[in-house]
Amino acid sequence: TTLMSRFTNAYGEALVTDHPLLTRLAATADRVASATISSIAAIGIPKARAATIHTLATLVASGEVRIEPAVDVRVLTRQLLEVPGIGPWTAEYIVMRAVHWPDAFPASDLVLRRNAGNLTPSELVRAAEKWRPWRAYAAMHLWRR
């Protein structure tokens, strides 16, 4: 996305390759933690969201929070939910994408709910029980419908 491009340009490390579109690495937690909330907001991120990003980057950079495949997802989810500005959808999305947890399922997602038959989040959670422990794959399928 455009916003992700601006974020990567601002905080990602420069990369020299033969490919003209590969010019930066993803931003590291250390680099984002060393930025100010105002500078993060200046690239077009709402200030409250910039504060959330900064707080999470600081926790990851310090080692207090580990976002990696070997973590206990229950512990990580609890830690994520303690960060102001991170709710259940974001926590589930992080464990799905960054930790590769196959049972993550952001049941409050509007597209998932619509594509599953306009279910409420609690109805979708109940319906998704039969997809355990592979609910993230079901989410990917529903997002593509």
Identify the residue ranges that each predicted region occupies:
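HhH-family (HhH-GPD) DNA N-glycosylase catalytic core used in base-excision repair
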Residues: 1-145
